Design a protein with these regions (language model features):
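Basic/polar N-terminal segments that are highly enriched at the extreme N-terminus
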Residues: 1-6, 129-133
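A solvent-exposed, acidic/Ser-Thr-rich amphipathic alpha-helical stretch
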Residues: 4-6, 21-76
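Solvent-exposed, amphipathic alpha-helical segments
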Residues: 7-18
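Short solvent-exposed loop/turn micro-motifs enriched in small/polar/acidic residues
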Residues: 10, 60-62, 93-95
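A short, acidic/glycine-rich surface segment
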Residues: 63, 85-89, 121-122
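Exposed beta-sheet edge and beta->alpha loop/turn motif
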Residues: 81-108, 113
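Low-complexity, intrinsically disordered terminal/linker segments enriched in charged
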Residues: 110-133
Length: 133
């Protein structure tokens, strides 16, 4: 398991760097072929499409890996914070969240379920990071 853990830590660091490269194909390369993600309980979508949408919405997107939690069931929780400036509203956001990963035998992400506080995200899109409604 120690070797697997190191490989997953390396995967998480590379995944974070891929998001910061603002290259959706690089993000998708960390998933099995046809990799999917579901965000906030929504329908699954192709990771490349989800990454492309976030990169378009936040052209200066930065993702920071906050922590990794290796669970008893074999899944991994990748905790992150993303920052960026909305291309639409011009407001800056700083949103923490996490993804629950299932890792495939080949060491890539087989499935991801991502979560963040949608209400706080929406508030920041309208009013910025430090402003209140």
């Amino acid at each position: 398991m120690a070797r697997d853990r190191r490989q997953i830590e390396q995967l998480a660091r590379a995944y974070t760097e891929a998001w910061c490269s603002r290259d959706s194909a690089r993000v998708a390369a960390h998933y099995v072929a046809g990799g999917m993600i579901a965000v906030n309980g929504g329908d699954e979508a192709a990771i490349a499409e989800v990454a492309e949408a976030f990169i378009a919405a936040f052209p200066d997107i930065e993702v920071f890996m906050d922590d990794l939690d290796f669970r008893q069931d074999g899944s991994v929780e990748y905790r992150w914070t993303f920052t960026g400036t909305s291309a639409e509203s011009g407001e800056s956001v700083r949103v923490p969240g996490y993804e629950e990963w299932t890792i495939a035998p080949n060491g890539l992400i087989a499935q991801s379920r991502g979560y963040y506080d949608q209400a706080e995200y929406d508030r920041q899109l309208q009013h910025g990071i430090d402003q209140t409604t």
